[in-house]
Amino acid sequence: MNKKSKKMLVAILLGFLLVTTIYNNWRLNEMAGSNPGILNVGFDVDDTILFSRDVFLNIPEDKRNPTDYGWVNMQDEKLSLFIEPTVELIKYFKNNGHNVFLITARSGENGDYLAKFLSDGLGSDITKDENLFFCPKESINGVRYTTKHYQMKKLNLNLFYGDADTDMIAALKANVHPVRIVRHNESIEQYGNNYFGNVKDGEKEKNPFQMNDLKIFYSKSVGIYGESI
């Protein structure tokens, strides 16, 4: 190969490398959204932001089957408490310029009451259908399944914090990294059908783990679905 051909080959290779680099940078920016370095972070509400056990334990009998979420969404001011470490985490993300979205399995009747309560407690504007989304479970052949993954995909989330197995599953289905918020012991004891969390109901197919098992998971900071804890 003569000197001129070598120079031409080098020029072609450099041009190809430049185009490839530009394309890869464009793809990275596309994956990160319009603001590279800015995360889209999602949070569940019940037992993640709010200790809302007393709301659900006090549902009147005539509003239980099916659950009257119009009633539930109006009770948080009286019966729910904010989980302060989660509140501080949300403030950290927002103060550092990240986008925060809240996704709940409650249905949206009277959802503005919940939005106002969350706004007051988090110190930032929470608005239904803007950064607070209601994604009730879908019933198929009598079994209720999460629908949160649809909203997670729309929001292009990077992280999702939740307490329930269904939160972890929804995040994985949406290709979002799941982070487990460990439920308060009183919540574990009173309600919830987590494979991970139900350790006080005996050894059953739906409750395969005991408290010692959970302590091992906690010590490793990894849950049964590979989620962070």
Name each model-derived stretch.
Residues 98, 107-229:
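C-terminal cap/substrate-recognition subdomain and adjoining C-terminal extension
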Residues 2-45, 200, 205-229:
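Non-catalytic pre-domain segments flanking phosphatase-related domains
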Residues 26-139:
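Alpha-helical substrate-recognition element adjacent to the catalytic core
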Residues 10, 19, 41, 45, ...:
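Extended aliphatic helical segments
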